[in-house]
């Protein structure tokens, strides 16, 4: 395992966390000031993992963001024997190191899309990056979807013209509810097991994926910040959120990885919306 690689990746995820939290709090302040309300603020709580490592969970419940969670973690140790076969390079001794950031935003307004994003770096006897971002609007708009995809395409095209079509396809396939036979949202990009043989390039790409998210999602939120919405639209949002819950509990790799490595349960389930309905 490479100590320097572990340190620089972990440091970046912490830095990205700070940038995201600052920008989301700024949006809260803009809205609250205009409406004469008290803006939400992130509340942080640290946790430690018995087997090694830990993380920091940042959660904000505000006037714009009904619930947004940003979790960073750096954990290490040994996979259980039952889980080793599922992780590349873990078959022999099961040792691993994993660091990353995960964030999910659920907005009060049903007109503003929910968003999920994560990037991570993992070492076993092998090493790789993974992650991506995806958008879940309740009332999709073509221009908004195109803008979201364009930000990630620009990040991808800097490195390989084949990245975006490949990672978009992987996102569409991954965020699909098989039991419902429907996609979770309008996609984005999703990549895993990325190791081109050039650590610096793969790390730079992963950083640019984070910067792409910061460049586009706050703009999407601000564009609809003051649009009025109805009780019927809110009800529809709550029902559609049920799909989000179903995916995260049935299919999400991050949820499974966290639970199988004795991660913090509250941090792992941080992505679940604060209120949801099933019809």
Swiss-Prot record:
Keywords: Cytoplasm, Heme biosynthesis, Metal-binding, Oxidoreductase, Porphyrin biosynthesis. GO terms for molecular function: coproporphyrinogen oxidase activity; metal ion binding; protein homodimerization activity. It catalyses: coproporphyrinogen III + O2 + 2 H(+) = protoporphyrinogen IX + 2 CO2 + 2 H2O. Its EC number is 1.3.3.3. The lineage of its organism: Bacteria, Pseudomonadati, Pseudomonadota, Alphaproteobacteria, Rickettsiales. This is Oxygen-dependent coproporphyrinogen-III oxidase. GO terms for cellular component: cytoplasm. The record marks 179 as: Important for dimerization. Pathway: Porphyrin-containing compound metabolism; protoporphyrin-IX biosynthesis; protoporphyrinogen-IX from coproporphyrinogen-III (O2 route): step 1/1. It is found in: Cytoplasm. Homodimer.
